[in-house]
Amino acid sequence: MKLGEIQRIAVLGSGTMGPGIAQSYAMGGYEVLLYDISKPALDKARGMLLANLDTYVQEDLLPVEEADGIYRRITFTNKLSKALDGVQFVQETVAENPGVKRSVFEQVDAMVSPETIVVSNASSLNPFELVPESRKANFAAAHWFAPPQILPLVEVAKGEKTSKETMETVLTLLRACGKTPVRLEKYVPGYIINRIQILLNTEVFYLLENGICTPEQLDLAVKASLMPRGMVLGLVQRYDFTGLDISANNIMNGSYVMPETSRHPAALFDHVDKGELGIKTGKGFYDYGGRSREELC
């Protein structure tokens, strides 16, 4: 499947990521069918999309007419057969459950043409182990980041049987939608960013649990150093600007010892146990004062 053959895109799953991903494809000019088995989930997705587009208009990022056109290009449906009718590209973003994803992949494989490209937003699961053998040449991982309508990165990983044409089409399509796809030559659990994030999580929870700083001070430190520098140099090029000899010396002579990784950090799970789940409940590490998710996003 080549880029010019793609006109209709199905986005399967309207949870946390689906609405923003659907918006991104629609902003690229494609007709999008957003599917979820749950009508309430679709109603919520519709509200999120309208709020997102209204924000773009209010911030002068889009004229009203263009925002209306983007919204009109998205169809909401709770019927999988309708979502897959005549599509050339399928973006899966259903629950992170192997049984659910495997079932969806099997249904998709049976309902779309052999040439249709299917990509997965799986984060903690290996999607290449769940997709039918018959689809593997036209299958890739396309891992987005929240909020997907804003953050440009999409990590695109190939499987052992992913065709060269499929990879090129996925990468080109994402660029056409204004995204920044980063190509991984093979799948690795966590892709790039989540692997780095796991290491950061270890330090974040260590610092919070030991009372070394507050969440606000930790975030301030990162925003005032790592993030602005990272926008320019990333993580690897920074070593070149520091000097590889200096970096090597710092590693050899440093007194820092990384804390042990915990799969149940108290700094996180204490909030979870109290039902403080972040913006979805109005409180997490920060207190959002009763503001809704739509107001905050």
Residue ranges, per PLM feature:
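NAD(P)-dependent Rossmann-like dehydrogenase/reductase catalytic/cofactor-binding core
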Residues: M1-L3, G28, A176-T180, E209-N210, ...
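NAD(P)+-binding Rossmann beta1-loop-alpha1 motif at the extreme N-terminus of oxidoreductases
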Residues: M1-T55, E59, M111
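Amphipathic alpha-helical segments at domain termini/boundaries
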Residues: I9, Q23, M27, I70-F89, ...
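Internal alpha-helical scaffold of NAD(P)-dependent oxidoreductase catalytic cores
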Residues: G28-Y30, V156-Y187, I198-R229
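Rossmann-like NAD(P)-binding element
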Residues: A41-K44, Q58-I117, S124-N126
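A general alpha-helix detector
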Residues: N52, P152-L153, L200-V204, N249-G254
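Rossmann-fold dinucleotide-binding core
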Residues: I117-K186, G190-N194
